[in-house]
Regions:
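Active-site catalytic pocket residues across diverse enzymes, especially alpha/beta-hydrolases
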Residues: 44, 119, 175-179
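Structural motif
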Residues: 32-33, 54-55, 137-138, 162-166
Length: 206
């Protein structure tokens, strides 16, 4: 059995109780490199085999999963945040389906919620916004045209924008072009809830 487990947003104690117990029971753990707090690996039992997926190809990850299944070992695939958000789990699940290997998912706390907690803010304020849009700027992974920053900005709902810190000037321009007022409150949060977290309050323009 393979378990896709969300490691949470950063702080080791923000993993779910279920996620912690799965780590304690695992015979094999494949974790997402530096994106996952290494303190979480302390939950693993002494005999657990641990692999860093940052140094592995998808084929190598799947090979470990298949070997574990054949040996009747329980495997945890430890992803950052919540596996369902930018976790690239679908391609792994498709291959597991093809191989006939069963799997389950355990949710985690995503970065946008860790950031909100660090800033003591609420995304859904009566009279301002009752919706939260989770999106990203286009990088190596293409974003459908209908999901452009401008089209989402037109709703003027709260937005959590991932994987985009290297494109802040362009992001600001596109948010304003889409409909946000220049003075709309904004924040930049790096490594939310980690010990070296950095957070900056600003506006959409700045």
């Amino acid at each position: 059995m393979v378990y896709f487990v969300g490691a949470g947003t950063g702080a080791a104690d923000l993993i779910t109780v279920r996620g912690m117990r799965l780590l304690e029971q695992a015979d094999v753990i494949i974790y997402a490199g530096s994106l996952v707090n290494p303190e979480l690996l302390a939950y693993a039992k002494k005999e657990c085999e641990i692999f860093n997926s940052a140094t592995m190809t998808l084929s190598e990850v799947l090979a470990v999963m298949q070997q574990s299944q054949e040996a009747e070992k329980m495997l945890v695939r430890l992803h950052t945040g919540d596996p369902s958000i930018y976790g690239a789990i679908r391609e792994q699940m498709d291959e597991l389906d093809r191989l006939g290997i069963p799997y389950e998912s355990c949710p985690g706390v995503s970065a946008c919620f860790g950031a909100a907690a660090s800033l003591n803010i609420e995304y859904t304020l009566p009279g301002i916004s009752q919706s939260l849009i989770i999106t990203r700027m286009e990088g190596k992974t293409k974003v459908p045209t209908k999901e452009s920053i401008e089209s989402f900005a037109a709703h003027q709902a709260s937005m959590a924008i991932y994987l985009s810190t290297g494109m802040l000037e362009e992001l600001s321009q596109r948010l304003i072009a889409g409909g946000y007022e220049k003075h709309t409150p904004a924040a930049l949060v790096y490594k939310a809830t980690w010990k070296d977290e950095e957070a900056y309050l600003c506006t959409v323009e700045t």
